[in-house]
Design a protein with these regions (language model features):
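Extended, regular secondary-structure scaffolds
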Residues: 116-213
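Extended, helix-rich architectural segments
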Residues: 1-131
């Protein structure tokens, strides 16, 4: 899959997000410049900059080196623990799984401009879904804290590309956290295709996901 096709999702994801959250339509956000910037950053990180052809494909791979050094410096004196109760001890045990891979994940986040950790439960274990900036769109803020965002991920099965668009919203007023998922199928990686019902998903990864939580 070409990198341009892989990261072009923001251009067609906007229309879907607008339908999910018309009051905060993404037309209010300047994604064009950021989309182009993230694409360039990812190309550099993968050591595939567009200008490498002019250099006979010989590069110093500085993008990955710089991102790795940023992540190393961040983690040198980093310490984080969850304490205070039996529940905290359990959460700390789960949290340590993230800490083991945090430096590698941070490197990718440094390369593309940001990262978000989204926990989920599988077989009774809390696992971290590490989502880089090119895979989510913030929608709402409260005192600088993101209170609504849309996440994107894609799975390939056979000749079909399955896309999950997940909107998460937290309300301080109601103290509620809602998750709304929509699923799409397409024969092309750069086209979101048609929305389908969850029960029609040919995807083991999302087959048991409740579309409204």
């Amino acid at each position: 899959m070409k990198r341009r096709a892989k990261y072009v999702f923001l251009s067609w994801l906007r229309s879907i997000v607008n339908k999910l959250d018309p009051e905060n339509a993404t037309s209010n956000y300047q994604f064009d410049n950021m989309e182009e910037a993230m694409e360039v950053w990812l190309e550099i990180y993968a050591d595939e900059p567009s200008w490498s052809k002019d250099c006979h494909n010989k590069t110093l791979n500085l993008g990955a080196t710089i991102a790795s050094e940023f992540a190393r410096l961040i983690m040198i004196e980093f310490e984080s623990k969850i304490t205070g109760s039996e529940r905290a001890d359990y959460l700390q045990e789960q949290y340590e799984r993230l800490l083991e891979q945090l430096r590698v994940r941070l490197e990718a986040g440094c390369a593309v401009g940001g990262i978000m950790f989204k926990p989920y439960v599988r077989n009774g274990v809390i696992l971290p879904d590490c989502i880089t900036q090119d895979k989510f769109i913030p929608l709402n803020y409260s005192n600088g804290i993101i209170t609504a965002a849309v996440f994107f991920n894609q799975e390939v099965k056979g000749k079909n590309y399955y896309t999950r668009v997940e909107k998460q919203t937290y309300s301080y007023e109601n103290k509620s956290h809602t998750i709304e998922s929509h699923f799409f199928v397409s024969s092309s990686p750069d086209n979101i295709g048609a929305e389908i019902n969850p029960e029609n998903l040919d995807s083991d990864m999302w087959s048991r996901i409740d579309p409204y939580i």
